Amino acid sequence: FDKAKWLNDILNQEGITKSVIVGQSMGGYVGQAYAQLYPDKMTGFVSIDSAPLQRSYVTAVEIWLLKRMEPVYAHYPWKWLLKSGSEGVATSDYGRNLMREMMLTYDGNQKRYAQIAGHGFRILAAAIEKNLPYEIKCPALLICGTQDHAGSCIRYNKAWHRNTKIPLTWIEGAGHNSNTDKPEQVNRLIDEFAANILQQET
């Protein structure tokens, strides 16, 4: 929720009163927290390879695991973590290299990488456990790669679409970072979505 509040502060600072929030992975969770806190300020929401925050979608085992990921990241051999981390989130060389480059920032400081990742998973678990509605009251779009193997993203998105009727677009052959695997397609979907909202507003 801190991130959603920071986002609101930034939008206020910039004088933006009606926003289309686009969030990838953790960014999609921030968007849902923003919708919970400021439901009247969002005119659109795009989730890219993220998942619903409602408690009903997540098993108790998944929440238990989210809270305990830091030691896994800390004790996993760094070379293997680097390989699985970069190859696990993307299918394209471009996407994998971006992830590898980011992870190499922590080369020699795996403990710090594990702390940051663990913190992210714990705040996600805490947001889910709040058991809030996280209702999206504005036009929305779900985007997910067909090769997204991060957690249970594919299963979550199918259920999210089925339960809410929010349109879901699959990005063929893309991984968890579908915006880096198929950037042109994802950008086009976002552009069209935002243009439709703008048209409705005028």
Write out the residue ranges for each language-model feature.
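Conserved alpha/beta-hydrolase catalytic His-Asp/Glu region
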Residues: S56-V58, H75-E135
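Active-site acidic short loop of glycosyltransferases
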Residues: N12-K18, P39-D40, K137-C138, K165
